[in-house]
Amino acid sequence: MIGPSSQISKILLTLLFLLIIFYVFMDVELYLRIHNYAIERNYHTNVSLPASVVGPSTSESGSGSIGGSSSSSSSSSSSTSTKLPTAGDRQPSYEDHTWISCDINPLCHVTVKAILLDHTNHYLFAPLATMFDNVIGFSRSTFITPNMISFFHVGVACLAGKLVASDSLGYRRLGVLLFQIRTFLDDLDGHVARVRKHIRGERSEIGTSGYYVDGLCDGLGCIALLLGIFFYLKNNPPRRGYSIIPMSDSKLPEPTMMIPKMKATTRKVAKNVISFTGQLLLSSTAWNRYIAVYQNMLEREDVSGNQSHCQDYVFKSTWFFCVAWMWRIVNVHALLHCVLLSIFCDKLWDFLRAIRYSGYIILLVAICLTEMHILEAQNYIFNSTACSNISL
């Protein structure tokens, strides 16, 4: 599947399975962390929490935990699938119970963006970016800015795209590794920007100049990769079947339609690459929209104490976790990881053909389910009587 050396293939395949098992294990740990520990709302390291967000009274130990509710409020929220937590369900802080430093622990600061982020960026690149910055000190440097890192990884992506277009499988694999380095640098520039703004955890600063610069650089990097994919497939058109070997020595007439046939192959390559590009655009647009919507709905602080408890209730619901997990595997970063894996395994054309139509169906289903959840959650938090009748 991966190359002529069976030993290397077995090692790489084993590493892939171990990585998948690690992702599943971390997802289970993330689910348990969300349900068993308080959700920290203070995302700024130098800002104290408002009283309405910390909890209903200072005598209670759980900061940022789910609020209590009386039996009457449970009955008024009968439109939801489960009842609200009671006052006795105050939850401890995760920071006080984990043995891994929250500086590198991806489960420590749980935010909307962290839950919607793909597994590789959340569990691997984000902690690695933190450790790399702790050693090199980019966030403490006044010379290097996050935007400089963003522009630099565009150059890395261009080099990766050039290698991906190569006829050599070894160079294409090197291009895959370079593009993953670009993804790591993308995590690094976000980490440096958040550290300088004293923001803990993953969070999108929507509307800032850095947000748009980072988006522009990410788009340019994806374009470089897609161009490399197109030129590789154009120069190495996939075979449609086995060549027919003549049984006699008689010379066959030369084919007269070679040029039109090559044009048809190029058009087919272009259609598949354009189809995948459309999926990346659709996934990126929807994913960034839902990060903005959920951040505004679940992490805003200009709400009443009752609404704050309902925000925590929605955040901890299994329905929201399922919606978020769905986007972890269909967002633009996950799609890029899949196409990079197909390039590394020399299965690029098979992947593009398999996802040409099914990818759109999966994305549309994910969008419809997410829109339904958003409408239900917004109505529950801001419009229903369940939140207004919670007994604090």
UniProtKB/Swiss-Prot annotation:
It catalyses: CDP-ethanolamine + an N-acylsphing-4-enine = an N-acylsphing-4-enine 1-phosphoethanolamine + CMP + H(+); CDP-ethanolamine + an N-acyl-sphingoid base = an N-acyl-sphingoid 1-phosphoethanolamine + CMP + H(+). It comes from the Eukaryota. Disulfide bonds: none annotated. It is a multi-pass membrane protein. GO terms for molecular function: ceramide phosphoethanolamine synthase activity. Its EC number is 2.7.8.48. Residues 32-140, 234-271, 341-356 are cytoplasmic. GO terms for biological process: ceramide phosphoethanolamine biosynthetic process. InterPro entries: CDP-OH_PTrfase_TM_dom (IPR043130). Residues 1-10, 162-212, 289-319, 378-392 are lumenal. Keywords: Cell membrane, Golgi apparatus, Lipid biosynthesis, Lipid metabolism, Membrane, Phospholipid metabolism, Sphingolipid metabolism, Transferase, Transmembrane, Transmembrane helix. GO terms for cellular component: Golgi apparatus; Golgi membrane; plasma membrane. Belongs to the CDP-alcohol phosphatidyltransferase class-I family. Catalyzes the biosynthesis of ceramide phosphoethanolamine (CPE) through the transfer of a phosphatidyl head group from cytidine 5'-diphosphate (CDP)-ethanolamine on to the primary hydroxyl of ceramide. This is Ceramide phosphoethanolamine synthase. It comes from Drosophila melanogaster. The gene is Cpes.
